Amino acid sequence: MFITFEGIDGCGKTTQAVLLAKYLSDLYGEHRVVLTREPGGTSLNELIRGALLGLTDYKLDGITELMLFIAMRRESFVKVVLPGLLAGKIVISDRFTDSTVAYQGYGCGVDLALVGMLNSLVADVVPDITFVIDASIELALARTSLNGFENHGPEFYDRVREGFRTIVANNPHRCHMIDCKSDAAEDVYSTHDRIVALFRAITKDKLKVAK
């Protein structure tokens, strides 16, 4: 099974991905659950991620950004995601193809058909379940310290947020919007409880995990 978490920077998706991975690891065993992230997931990708996050006052144009993240996705897909799925494990990814659509497509204005074509080229797998964590722009920006590479400004993140909402509306069979209202611990775990309940309702007795 392939599960992805999506949302704007600072929405809380990384925390929720980690919490779900721990829940499923406790349930099925750590060796049956793979947690990865984009950009990242492999030693090469983590080096590139570190370099990107260390940039200040440096902007990539939309196409350059798209091609860079697409190449990193291919590396992560063939080294982490696909092997995990073929082994019958539960793979949880903090970001996947929907992020490219929302960020480079809706956020940067890159042609959506081009984004879709490149996504299909490098990763011909569609997630079984996608949890989109929705938080206000104000809350998300207050949660995270964005560097020069990430900090596009509130208007950009508003476009990205609307992009994620459009993705959810267009893919109701796999995408589930989860509202996140605050940073309070009780709200974080309340969100986790909602995700677990939704996961159990979706999978029921259908989930098969490799021994």
Swiss-Prot record:
Show the InterPro entries listed in the entry: P-loop_NTPase (IPR027417), Thymidylate_kin-like_dom (IPR039430), Thymidylate_kin_CS (IPR018095), Thymidylate_kinase (IPR018094)
Q: Which keywords fit this entry according to its UniProt record? A: ATP-binding, Kinase, Nucleotide biosynthesis, Nucleotide-binding, Transferase
Q: Does the keyword ATP-binding apply?
A: yes
- Any idea which GO molecular function terms this record carries? ATP binding; dTMP kinase activity
What are its E.C. numbers? 2.7.4.9
Q: Where do the annotations place ATP binding?
A: G7, I8, D9, G10, C11, G12, K13, T14
Protein name in the entry: Thymidylate kinase
Q: Which organism was this protein described from? A: Anaplasma marginale (strain Florida)
What are the top taxonomic ranks of the organism? Bacteria, Pseudomonadati, Pseudomonadota, Alphaproteobacteria, Rickettsiales
